[in-house]
Amino acid sequence: MTNQAEEKRILIMAGGTGGHVFPALAVAKYLSQQGWKVRWLGTAERMEARLVPQHGFDIDFIDIKGVRGNGLMRKLAAPFKIIRSVMQARAVIKKFKPHVVMGMGGFASGPGGVAAKLSGIPLVLHEQNAIPGMTNRLLSRIASEVLCAFDGTFTDIKAETVGNPIRKELIALGEKRKPVCDDDSLKVLVVGGSLGAKIFNDVMPSVLEGVSKTHSMTVWHQVGRDNLATVKAEYQRLGQDGSVSVAEFIDDMEAAYRWADVVVCRSGALTVSELAAVGLPSLLVPYPHAVDDHQTKNAKVLVNAGAAFLLPQPIVDTSKLMTKLSMLASDKQELCNMGQRARDVAILDATQRVANVCIRLAEKG
């Protein structure tokens, strides 16, 4: 650890979803190991309030909520609330005196980014999705550096493609993972997120029943909160309970990725980057209600590389999934090829790239 006079400080703004928080935590841990003091800016009602302290970082809260889709009165009041939240963020900056402020998405990023600009502190933005969110689109005009995970995210400003920071354990897994290209049972990991994906919960029991008539297939199905009993009962009704493991949550995604031959999942930015780093083929069903349909654009990063299949939710049914999984079960070499193509598009040093931009700006003063 450097002494107090030399210690660099960064204020990180990332919240609301794991897709914002976890990449930011990867950068925070890296910089902390380099002797930096890290502090967080977030909102008390969102997941960062719980996750960030669990990982050993202090967090300050400001009062801010999203404005998309709100009623007229809330929209009229929004400018006054934003001004208040900017003032709150400026107070945090004045007290903490960061050398750099980094925004990675979430409600606090907007006021925090404006406060950084008003305070004369370098502002780094990182956009995880292939289509930038509204806050990052606005802040990109005043940021010192704009970073993105995927090529072509920002079309009207200069942005550096650096990838999405992910946990170093997953990068290590990708380096040593050997895809199964023999005649073993096809191992299918189904991930629906914390609440589960209803489409997966509805069709996967029938998919397993259908594919198992001609190929050996086992499933590890993450069904989400309060869905365990219903989905498990459907697998049992179809006589497939011996070929499936059903869980509300999967705490150890490293173990799940290590086990799987192919993944059926949504296409959030972090998921896409993890699949690439680990080198896993996938069937991607973008969440149809994502803002600006950004999950479809995320998915195309892997689809265009030949590492994944894109299945828009309106066309997903038992037959579609059966066809794709049966094809992969009968052609393990293509499964291996898809995994290698996924690995080929991965940016494995994203954490260091983002951190190095912060370090460079701090050294410039």
From Swiss-Prot:
<dbReference type="Pfam" id="PF04101">
    <property type="entry name" value="Glyco_tran_28_C"/>
</dbReference>
<dbReference type="Pfam" id="PF03033">
    <property type="entry name" value="Glyco_transf_28"/>
</dbReference>
<protein>
    <recommendedName>
        <fullName>UDP-N-acetylglucosamine--N-acetylmuramyl-(pentapeptide) pyrophosphoryl-undecaprenol N-acetylglucosamine transferase</fullName>
        <ecNumber>2.4.1.227</ecNumber>
    </recommendedName>
</protein>
<dbReference type="GO" id="GO:0071555">
    <property type="term" value="P:cell wall organization"/>
</dbReference>
<dbReference type="GO" id="GO:0050511">
    <property type="term" value="F:undecaprenyldiphospho-muramoylpentapeptide beta-N-acetylglucosaminyltransferase activity"/>
</dbReference>
<dbReference type="GO" id="GO:0008360">
    <property type="term" value="P:regulation of cell shape"/>
</dbReference>
<feature type="binding site">
    <location>
        <begin position="269"/>
        <end position="274"/>
    </location>
    <ligand>
        <name>UDP-N-acetyl-alpha-D-glucosamine</name>
    </ligand>
</feature>
<keyword id="KW-0328">Glycosyltransferase</keyword>
<dbReference type="GO" id="GO:0009252">
    <property type="term" value="P:peptidoglycan biosynthetic process"/>
</dbReference>
<dbReference type="InterPro" id="IPR007235">
    <property type="entry name" value="Glyco_trans_28_C"/>
</dbReference>
<keyword id="KW-0472">Membrane</keyword>
<keyword id="KW-0131">Cell cycle</keyword>
<dbReference type="InterPro" id="IPR004276">
    <property type="entry name" value="GlycoTrans_28_N"/>
</dbReference>
<feature type="binding site">
    <location>
        <position position="167"/>
    </location>
    <ligand>
        <name>UDP-N-acetyl-alpha-D-glucosamine</name>
    </ligand>
</feature>
<dbReference type="GO" id="GO:0051991">
    <property type="term" value="F:UDP-N-acetyl-D-glucosamine:N-acetylmuramoyl-L-alanyl-D-glutamyl-meso-2,6-diaminopimelyl-D-alanyl-D-alanine-diphosphoundecaprenol 4-beta-N-acetylglucosaminlytransferase activity"/>
</dbReference>
<keyword id="KW-0961">Cell wall biogenesis/degradation</keyword>
<feature type="binding site">
    <location>
        <position position="250"/>
    </location>
    <ligand>
        <name>UDP-N-acetyl-alpha-D-glucosamine</name>
    </ligand>
</feature>
<keyword id="KW-0573">Peptidoglycan synthesis</keyword>
<dbReference type="InterPro" id="IPR006009">
    <property type="entry name" value="GlcNAc_MurG"/>
</dbReference>
<keyword id="KW-0132">Cell division</keyword>
<keyword id="KW-1003">Cell membrane</keyword>
<keyword id="KW-0133">Cell shape</keyword>
<keyword id="KW-0997">Cell inner membrane</keyword>
<comment type="similarity">
    <text>Belongs to the glycosyltransferase 28 family. MurG subfamily.</text>
</comment>
<dbReference type="GO" id="GO:0051301">
    <property type="term" value="P:cell division"/>
</dbReference>
<feature type="binding site">
    <location>
        <position position="129"/>
    </location>
    <ligand>
        <name>UDP-N-acetyl-alpha-D-glucosamine</name>
    </ligand>
</feature>
<comment type="function">
    <text>Cell wall formation. Catalyzes the transfer of a GlcNAc subunit on undecaprenyl-pyrophosphoryl-MurNAc-pentapeptide (lipid intermediate I) to form undecaprenyl-pyrophosphoryl-MurNAc-(pentapeptide)GlcNAc (lipid intermediate II).</text>
</comment>
<dbReference type="GO" id="GO:0030259">
    <property type="term" value="P:lipid glycosylation"/>
</dbReference>
<dbReference type="GO" id="GO:0005975">
    <property type="term" value="P:carbohydrate metabolic process"/>
</dbReference>
<feature type="binding site">
    <location>
        <position position="295"/>
    </location>
    <ligand>
        <name>UDP-N-acetyl-alpha-D-glucosamine</name>
    </ligand>
</feature>
<feature type="binding site">
    <location>
        <position position="194"/>
    </location>
    <ligand>
        <name>UDP-N-acetyl-alpha-D-glucosamine</name>
    </ligand>
</feature>
<comment type="pathway">
    <text>Cell wall biogenesis; peptidoglycan biosynthesis.</text>
</comment>
<dbReference type="GO" id="GO:0005886">
    <property type="term" value="C:plasma membrane"/>
</dbReference>
<keyword id="KW-0808">Transferase</keyword>
<feature type="binding site">
    <location>
        <begin position="17"/>
        <end position="19"/>
    </location>
    <ligand>
        <name>UDP-N-acetyl-alpha-D-glucosamine</name>
    </ligand>
</feature>
